[in-house]
Amino acid sequence: MNDIIRIGTRKSALALIQTQLVADELRQVCPGIQVEIVTKDTLGDRILDKPLQEFGGKGVFVSEFEQAIQEGVIDLAVHSAKDLPMELAEGLTIAAVSGREDPRDVLVTMRGHKIRPESVVRIGTSSPRRQLQAGLMCKTLWPGAAGTECSTLRGNVHTRLRKLEEGNFDCIILAAAGLKRLGLLEQDTYEYTFLNPEEFIPAGGQGLMAVEAKAGTMAHSLTQAMDHAHGRLCLELERRVLKLLDAGCHEPIGIYSVPDNGQLEVWGISSRRGEVKRIHMTGGTSREDMEKLALEAWKGLM
């Protein structure tokens, strides 16, 4: 096969690693295919001094790649699934979903750093979901602390770690999947506290990669061979719940699911109108059962 598949991705080290994983798998399922990686900075990469919810939400990492697919500049785009907006651009589809890397959030501190009794813990995170749960778990995570203070933290993983090193925060919260893919968990500069995803609930799609394509194209057809059934199952349920909730990145909502013996187990958290709600439920994996489960989750989180 002499076809060239052009894959679009952001320029960050993590985005490039994730895209290389997709490119390598595509070469395995389509021997002889040529792959070209096309990089660009998105609006979300260029504006780092504001929370995402102030200038466009999740779509700021995706929309420029969607336009490039529609215009034929690239054939595929690789995204962290949690960055996908609820509505894809016209004619585009999620052609493949990866298997799930570690879905947990991680508290990262400088090695040896201690929280003083009765002090306020300075946390670097722009995520309302992480801010909510860090506050709720303050006494568990930092016994003796007076409370938490969360401040905006944007940029790629290395930028965020540098700001931690500069003393701007007592800790920052990052996704385990990104730290693992970047090989940063081997560094002894930091201490890592992995948070149980059944208690500190991840974002919908966290730990998953999604490959976007124009529906009906050769690239779409080829990429479908890479689709991971369990990853697809979880992403579809989690995105369905988020869509029912009409949730954007400005709302503190976590949703996480795990396939187990033909069932889907799901955990969720939300805070609306000042009331925190949690769910934990199980349902089947047929289309009908998944819709029923999503509706039950929605009702529990509203």
Kindly give the residue locations of the regions a language model identified.
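Short, Asp-centered acidic motifs that coordinate Mg2+ and/or phosphate
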Residues: 74-78, 170-171
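Short glycine-rich anion-binding loops that position phosphate/pyrophosphate groups of nucleotides
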Residues: 81-84, 177-179
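A conserved helix-loop-strand patch within extracytoplasmic ligand-binding domains
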Residues: 81-82, 88-147
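Short active-site-adjacent helix-start/loop capping segments
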Residues: 44-49, 77, 85-88
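Small-molecule-sensing regulatory modules
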Residues: 2-41, 46-47, 54, 62, ...
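Short, structured active-site "lid" loops
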Residues: 49-76
